[in-house]
Amino acid sequence: MSGFDRRSFLKASMVTAAATALAACASSERATGTTPKAAGKSVMGLVVPKMDEVRVGLIGVGERGIGFVHHFSRIEGARITAICDTDTLVLARAEKAINEYGRDKPAYFSKGDHAYRDLLNRDDVDIVVIATPWAWHHPMAKEAMLAGKHAFVEVPMAGTIEELWDLVDTAELTQRNCMMMENVCYGRDELMVLNMVRQGLFGELLHGEAAYIHELRWQMKEIDRKTGSWRTAYHAKYNGNLYPTHGLGPVAQYMNINRGDRLDYLTSVSSPSLGRAAYAKREFPADHQRNQLKYIGGDMNTSLIKTVKGRSIMVQHDTTTPRPYSRHNLIQGTNGVFAGFPNRIALENGGSGSYHEWDENMDSWYAKYDHPLWTRMGKEAEENGGHGGMDFLMCWRMIYCLRNGEALDQDVYDGAAWSAVFPLSVASVGDRGNSKDFPDFTRGVWQTAKPLGIVG
């Protein structure tokens, strides 16, 4: 066990045994919708000891993960110490990038699907960043925490309610962070709207609209590698909202979800599934594997969420039809509304005109309401890139919090609640749109948790 001392091994073995026992007794409770017994104390607002240097292990450096190689190589106080990917081509690309930055050589792992466990067994890794196909998110994040690491996992955090509970329980048992890296929460517009909401610009919040509308049929041509090689199959297996968090995450933060309010229940319906089959017929030979799949996922899925405080959120998913990109990013309050794509605002009091017409000139709004974090880091974020800078800013903020002993902006409860839309929408669609309840992953702590602050 290179780099993994006996004491650490024994401690990890004890935690793993406890986790196994907990899972055995909690499984039936999760399956029936009953809130399982807590595995440990809540990790709401978890603060861990300050780290002078954050040692980063990366699992998955393909289409998404290569960006993390660049970001963490540029952030002061972060050092990539280990990288794992089963694809030696993308691993070589990551190694080339590390060398170009003049950084110390990390350890590399690539032999087999479980080579990541060699990375987890190292004592020079503090956090594990997981950017792999969705099916690996849950097991890798869980094993990372059981190995004593903080887990940072790409979206969605997991694919079933039981898996989501398992990550919550493991985080509480190990007292480790498990953050789903919802990068859109760090976009300039989303941060500005959060600042507007916190300053009461829209009055009492009533309704939000979120979406992931992004035409991705072209990914079906990625057969042996890249995202489409594994993501296409989901459209033939599930009918619901496969990818809810990019739009929902920011709206949930506006509404203080898990910090004063909670997602209560959901109802979901889907349109017919036509676009994927038509695209396959047009673009591939009749005997091609893409024409052998039966695509059941509706081209457009629409889910309606009710919160415990009575507010409503519409969440849509469409990666099939030909239309412009949108996440909606709409928030409606008693004093007015903001909507994205394109950005526009209408207010009864405090606006520049009639609330019956949109104000689409955002310059004055940016000048007054740009989030302090963007004011401080926006230029550097844009220069370093990643979806307009949001990716870099997210990574910078993660490292900043760990180095300064601050709680992360997103926790395991956020990742669980936002990701739960996927399995709950599938269940609702399959049940004629009947409502499905969200678990209270916080076990009641949402009622006393402090809202996410405005940090600079």
Curated annotation (Swiss-Prot):
It holds the Pfam family GFO_IDH_MocA. Belongs to the Gfo/Idh/MocA family. Glycosyl hydrolase 109 subfamily. It is an enzyme of class 3 (hydrolase). Keywords: Glycosidase, Hydrolase, NAD, Signal. Transmembrane segments: none annotated. This is Glycosyl hydrolase family 109 protein 2. Predicted to be exported by the Tat system. The position of the signal peptide cleavage has not been experimentally proven. It comes from the Bacteria. The keyword NAD applies. Binds 1 NAD(+) per subunit. The NAD(+) cannot dissociate. Its EC number is 3.2.1.-. One of its GO terms (molecular function) is nucleotide binding. It comes from Shewanella sp. (strain ANA-3). InterPro entries: Gfo/Idh/MocA-like_OxRdtase_N, Gfo/Idh/MocA_oxidrdct_glycsds, Glyco_hydro_109_C, NAD(P)-bd_dom_sf, TAT_signal, TAT_signal_bac_arc. Residues 1-33 form the signal peptide. NAD(+) binds at E63, R64, D85, W134, A135, W136, H137, E154, V155, N183, Y243. Substrate binds at Y212, R231, Y243, P244, T245, H246, Y325. Glycosidase. Its cofactor is NAD(+).
